[in-house]
A protein has these predicted regions:
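Catalytic strand-loop-helix junctions within cyclic-nucleotide turnover domains
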Residues: 120-129, 150-152, 158-175
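Conserved beta-strand cores of small sensory beta-sandwich domains that regulate signal transduction
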Residues: 68-72, 110, 161-163
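Conserved metal-coordinating catalytic motifs of nucleotidyl cyclase and c-di-GMP turnover enzymes
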Residues: 48, 70-73, 114
């Protein structure tokens, strides 16, 4: 669109005001486009469409007084890296993301790492959030994922952990840290489970 405005500027070059006006409009459109790109880079994960880690860090001080933090991690992610390569992993992550969205949870979802999604359950205790995490885990475990090269469907599982904000927690990162420790402890022994911290 900016190029079209620039072309109009050259077309009406006989008038001294028209080129300046069209070039200024083109510059404004380019700046707005760059602003949108910067915003999307900071706040959105392009692969999944979820909010990014940066968005979590920026938005965490605005969370309500009562909330629960859940972490979902793809089981055997290192083996998936080797088996499917980069493109296959991206496709699997997109399919898992769609399955999580289809589970119709009320959580705000952030992509926090390669294989990690953080879910914020606003105004919910960890028992109510646990039920939603279990619903998500079951939805992914029951799904069959088809990759273009694969002739057989791929079965994937996720593990999760949930923790509620305590009064002693200074910020959401402390709750997230406690949740991650519980997930690591659980994942050391078993896959396809949801635990409470």
């Amino acid at each position: 669109f900016a190029a079209l405005l620039t072309a109009f500027g050259f077309y009406y070059a006989a008038d001294s005001v028209a080129p300046v006006l069209f070039f200024c409009l083109a510059a404004v459109i380019i700046i707005l486009g760059l602003g949108e790109e910067i915003y999307n880079d900071i706040y959105k994960d392009r692969l999944t469409g979820f909010a990014s880690r940066n968005a979590f860090i920026i938005q965490s001080p605005k969370f309500p007084l009562k909330y629960s933090v859940g972490i979902v991690s793809i089981d055997n992610y290192d083996n998936l890296k080797k088996a499917f390569g980069r493109r296959g992993r991206k496709n699997l992550l997109q399919m898992i993301s769609r399955r999580i969205v289809a589970a119709e949870t009320e959580a705000v979802i952030y992509r926090y790492g390669d294989d990690e999604l953080v879910l914020i359950f606003k105004n919910e205790d960890k028992n109510a959030a646990y039920e939603q995490m279990e619903q998500i885990r079951r939805a992914v475990a029951s799904a069959e994922f088809m990759l273009s090269k694969s002739k057989k469907p791929v079965k994937l599982t996720i593990s999760g952990s949930i923790s509620e904000k305590k009064r002693s927690d200074a910020n959401a990162l402390e709750v997230l840290s406690r949740t991650r420790k519980a997930l690591q402890k659980t994942s050391a022994f078993s896959f396809n489970v949801t635990s409470k911290a």
